[in-house]
Amino acid sequence: MLRIIMRSIFLLAIVLTVATSLCFAQAAPEEGGNEIQIWAGGGHSVAGGRGDTGAFNAGLRYGWILTDPHLPSILRGRFEYALDAVPVFLIFQPANTSYGVGFDPLGLKWNFVRRGRLSPYIELTGGVVFTNHEVPAFTNTVNFMDQAAFGTHILGEKYNWSLEVRYMHISNAGLANLNPGVNTVQVRLGIGKFFIRH
């Protein structure tokens, strides 16, 4: 399984390298632009679900900046729609460590206007994760994820870093008789860029 995870990470690195070589960099999100990012994050369970559970995941994001700036003052920003492919998803629970893959087809992101080198954002995402063991134990191997995050892009000349705090709820949504769910708070780090295709 470790070999599969390492191959997945290597493949993500190749895809990001090729994709970014086809793009032109820009300093911050702009209407008509796109975002590509490779990211990794992890955290631990919090109250509201099964405890003593940790999570680590890594993936690739592609986003579309859909609007010019809207709203007044500190709320001013642009709307982005994003997709995440998550080829590395580990859940460390008392019974075992589950390995899986996930996909987040619903990423709703609000990129606040740039403040110096910082471009803060908030986002809501939803998706599905498939694991080799039941998560939590005695439930199901297919689960849904809903997430909320607050973070910032640290803008660079060529690439941007992102740092965020993310709340993730994992639940089978009633696919199994038991549905206790797992709630985690995670820290996620990413590297990517905003670009416009010409």
Predicted segments, located by residue:
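Residues on the lipid-exposed face of transmembrane beta-strands in outer-membrane beta-barrel proteins
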Residues: 38-42, 58-64, 105-110, 124-128, ...
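Short loop/turn motifs that connect adjacent beta-strands in outer-membrane beta-barrel proteins
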Residues: 25-33, 67-79, 113-119, 155-161, ...
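Sequence/structural signature of outer-membrane beta-barrel proteins
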Residues: 43-49, 69, 86-94, 128-135, ...
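Transmembrane beta-strands of outer-membrane beta-barrel proteins
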Residues: 34-40, 77-85, 120-126, 161-165, ...
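Short glycine/proline- and aromatic-enriched beta-strand/turn motifs that initiate or cap beta-hairpins
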Residues: 24-67, 179, 184-198
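Gram-negative (and chloroplast) outer-membrane scaffold detector with strong preference
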Residues: 58-131
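Residues that define the transmembrane beta-barrel architecture of outer-membrane proteins
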Residues: 32-34, 52-58, 97-104, 118, ...
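Cleavable N-terminal export/targeting peptides
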Residues: 1-30, 196-198
